[in-house]
């Protein structure tokens, strides 16, 4: 396929148009007075959103060179979203500002390699200053403030803070669509998995159709149980101890199931059998998780173990187990805390190593069930369009909250970026490296100016007023006042700001050192052949 090649300023100008087109579409969403963007969908209703990365992902430009510029800034938003889960609009604005300032200097004859070095020096220093200024989250109220600012809704902020308080830092919080107008929070204690009793005759409460076992013994096996002979030695011991039993196996069928049900109905045995959750290797891993949580052992054929030789010591324990037709919940397992902690650390290491989003999600679920619990935020809305927008806001707020817990908080509303400029050390650099440092300093002013402009105010005037204000003061865009940002609860996660600075400077500095841009030449569509002429005399 033939290629089109652009060089020097011509190449960079085309890239800049793409950068500006995408950034201008995204930056209108910044701050509490930010606007929404409507995205056409190939099916269903349009999506109305103010989520930077969602908007960026939708943008494709017709001109291939401009599209490459847009794609580079799109990468900034996506990377920031992957690292911190929020701050994508800030990252996009910073990238646009660096490209704009940098291209001005290149047009004046600056060396792009030295400019890049200056940008990298300034970015590193900015991140070091940011880390020094970050304040550890100390209260549930601060978690609520971070979530409220990210979602643009105080009620959502409170809901997320409640969820974090219930499941802890390592617990999983999921977002689902509700069937009502209200947004609510549900929490699940203990380990829950999506498998219920294999027979309804095993219930202990026939009205609610649930089986509840107090202080049960828990038999775990990856084996399919079809013969009662395998279970008999172990069950005889549990009957002597008058203990209820939960059996978690690959499957329970045939004679074994019939005998268990008959003995349950006669009152000889208090037993509930459920199938093990998941499939294949994931099933084995979850069975091991349950074993560690309950202090038991998986009776595994792979390890050469036989069910008929299993002992009471190999069974797990729990305070209570509740089983419905499609759910099993184990509360207060009897496992050793050191074993559980070791398993948690092992799963965390696997999360760090995996590149698959699906595997990561499943590992996070296992981690939550072992260490904290699960909270579900059920999102209610009047229409599907509102539902999608609300869901995106809550997901962003959740990510921002986790980021704040991880690396602390800083003054919000772009105030920290001005603080960083003033606190940066003197680099003692001259020439084009100093110009690169100056590019970053000017770019860090862009977010606060944009927040003001989205309020209908002059960004330059607001910037100067903040500069003249006491330390820690910034622009409260919601109320259009100059206040102490942290005292008023206008805070941002340090991790989100760090990701925005890192990703914007990285991509923008690479764009500035671009000298040639190569794109595929579109093949012209051949015109369809016209209809053949008619023979003389034919109608």
Curated annotation (Swiss-Prot):
PROSITE patterns referenced in this protein's UniProt entry, alphabetically: CHAPERONINS_CPN60
Enzyme Commission code: 5.6.1.7
Reaction catalyzed: ATP + H2O + a folded polypeptide = ADP + phosphate + an unfolded polypeptide
Binding site for ATP: 29-32, 86-90, 413, 492
Gene Ontology CC: cytoplasm
GO biological process: protein refolding
Function: Together with its co-chaperonin GroES, plays an essential role in assisting protein folding. The GroEL-GroES system forms a nano-cage that allows encapsulation of the non-native substrate proteins and provides a physical environment optimized to promote and accelerate protein folding.
Name of this protein: Chaperonin GroEL
Organism this protein belongs to: Fusobacterium nucleatum subsp. polymorphum
Gene symbol of the encoding locus: groEL
């Amino acid at each position: 396929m033939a290629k089109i090649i652009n060089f020097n300023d011509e190449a960079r100008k085309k890239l800049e148009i793409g950068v500006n087109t995408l950034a201008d579409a995204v930056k209108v969403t910044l701050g509490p007075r930010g606007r929404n963007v409507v995205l056409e969908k190939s099916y269903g209703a349009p999506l109305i959103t103010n989520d930077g990365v969602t908007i960026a992902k939708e943008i494709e430009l017709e001109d291939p060179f401009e599209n490459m510029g847009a794609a580079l800034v799109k990468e900034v938003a996506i990377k920031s979203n992957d690292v911190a889960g929020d701050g994508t609009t800030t990252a996009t604005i910073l990238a646009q500002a660096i490209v704009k300032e940098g291209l001005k200097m290149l047009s004046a004859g600056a060396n792009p390699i030295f400019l890049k070095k200056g940008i990298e020096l300034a970015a590193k220093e900015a991140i070091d200053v940011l880390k020094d200024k970050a304040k550890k989250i100390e209260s549930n109220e601060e978690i609520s403030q971070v979530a409220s600012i990210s979602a643009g809704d105080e009620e959502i902020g409170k809901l997320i803070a409640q969820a974090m308080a219930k499941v802890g830092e390592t617990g999983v919080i999921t977002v689902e669509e509700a069937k009502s107008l209200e947004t609510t929070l549900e929490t699940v204690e203990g380990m829950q998995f999506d498998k219920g009793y294999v027979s309804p005759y095993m219930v202990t409460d026939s009205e609610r159709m649930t089986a509840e076992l107090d202080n049960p013994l828990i038999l775990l096996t990856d084996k399919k149980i079809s013969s009662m002979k395998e279970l008999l030695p172990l069950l005889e011991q549990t009957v002597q101890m008058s203990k209820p039993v939960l059996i978690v196996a690959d499957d329970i069928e045939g004679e074994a199931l019939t005998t268990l049900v008959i003995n349950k109905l006669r009152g000889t045995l208090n037993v509930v059998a459920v199938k093990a959750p998941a499939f294949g290797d994931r099933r084995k891993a979850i069975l091991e998780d349950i074993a560690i949580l309950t202090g038991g052992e998986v009776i595994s054929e792979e390890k050469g173990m036989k069910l008929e030789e299993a002992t009471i010591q190999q069974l797990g324990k729990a305070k209570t187990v509740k089983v419905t037709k499609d759910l099993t919940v184990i509360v207060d397992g009897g496992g050793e805390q050191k074993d559980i902690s070791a398993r948690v650390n092992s799963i965390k290491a696997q999360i760090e190593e995996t590149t698959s989003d699906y595997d990561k999600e499943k590992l996070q679920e296992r981690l939550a069930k072992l260490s904290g619990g699960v909270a579900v935020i059920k999102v209610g809305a009047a229409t599907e369009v509102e539902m999608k927008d609300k869901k995106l806001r809550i997901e962003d707020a959740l990510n921002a909250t986790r980021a704040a817990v991880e690396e602390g908080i800083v003054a919000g509303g772009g105030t920290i970026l001005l603080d960083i400029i003033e606190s940066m050390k003197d680099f003692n650099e001259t020439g084009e490296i100093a110009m690169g440092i100056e590019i970053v300093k000017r770019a860090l002013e862009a977010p606060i100016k944009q927040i003001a402009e989205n309020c209908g105010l002059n960004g330059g005037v607001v910037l100067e007023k903040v500069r003249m204000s006491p330390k820690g003061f910034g622009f409260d865009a919601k109320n259009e006042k100059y206040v102490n940002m942290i005292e008023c609860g206008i805070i941002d996660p340090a991790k989100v700001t760090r990701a925005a600075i890192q990703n914007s400077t990285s991509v923008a500095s690479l764009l500035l050192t671009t000298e040639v841009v190569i794109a595929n030449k579109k093949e012209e569509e051949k015109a369809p052949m016209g209809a053949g002429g008619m023979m003389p005399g034919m109608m």
